[in-house]
């Protein structure tokens, strides 16, 4: 690709109308531990001749040094970057007259390794390790370092930094999205589509949201949990409606709850405990709005209960409550959202399949309530609680993920901790003994991503 005119002079000395205008910058995202992928939109004005290619340039935010990559269309990959260093990117189009005007700078991105680890019950190959042997300590899933999002249910689903979708584990209802019902014991790419941004795995089905705001589902559908106004299983991803405004999704045992970009809350599927939040126990086979509010911020689901926060930091719950998992100081189920206490500082939430809930405040304190038969509340006993209780006095918790009967949590120092039921070694501590208080998992201090895994008997986590 030449950046000079035929007469040998560089384009900088020519009429700027001859070279292309600036492309419109999109986003820069991690493609590998040493490369980034840059998206953009071609300029409307191509200058004096057709565009022949593009040059994307990554600039270190620390000292301004640059490195470039070329391509014929969006996205362009820039390789040879330094691991752990922040960059922004610009893009310029090229025609026969030379290099055009550079775009505005992209978002900042830092190349990093994102390794996926798994442990615990390996039924149907749910750990992705190529076999069905249980593991009681974290084991890396393959050698890839480009995992970005993960979810665990009766199937495991994940996205990579290139936007591709992968799945493995149990597939009896087509929940791996591979157009068949054969189990897989190692990650398999789901179709050829990219731009997958968010995934969630329920009892026997999966959902995903793409970067364009569309929502897709596949797998079991006996209660209408896929949202298609029927109960027909799908063995590959199918778009749910035509909307492009979905921003967040969570799959429970046989129901689904989602938030749109306008802050409205929607639910569908099985509803025997009022877990859809619509004031009754009627199942729905397509999305139905929960109330009229437009201030919903975050939502998670357990087997049969739902937990959500609003933009004002308040915490709300509904659904099954036989174990006190709603945190309302009783064991009565609720069919519509009810606020938990008066706090307005809830920042991260998680719901466990067996009937327990965890939440972190903006101060970094971890609170928990509900069923405690395996010590999953982390309170040094096995007594259930029906209202929130703080786990110790620490204020350094950053992430929490409830599974069927155990918990994973990360601290601000990047360490990973686990507690609760330890059948199959799902706590990752090298044994199968239950723990009723937090115990550190190994010595790594780079745990960055925990999954939604409310129905899981195993563990997944990403280290970066």
Write out the residue ranges for each language-model feature.
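Pro/Thr/Ser/Gly-rich low-complexity, intrinsically disordered linker/stalk tracts
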Residues: 11-50, 83, 97-113
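Short, flexible loop/turn segments at beta-strand junctions in immunoglobulin-like
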Residues: 78-83, 192, 342, 393
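Extracellular low-complexity, O-glycosylation-prone stalks/linkers
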Residues: 41-75, 90, 99-105
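Short beta-strand elements bearing conserved aromatic residues within extracellular beta-rich modules
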Residues: 54-56, 165, 215, 265, ...
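Beta-strand-rich modules
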Residues: 78-100
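Short glycine/serine- and acidic-residue-enriched loop/turn motifs that recur at repeat junctions
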Residues: 95-101, 117-136, 169-185, 218-235, ...
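An edge-strand/N-cap motif at the start of beta-rich repeat modules
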Residues: 110-143, 147-150, 167, 172, ...
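Conserved core positions of repeat-based scaffolds
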Residues: 118, 155-158, 167, 205-208, ...
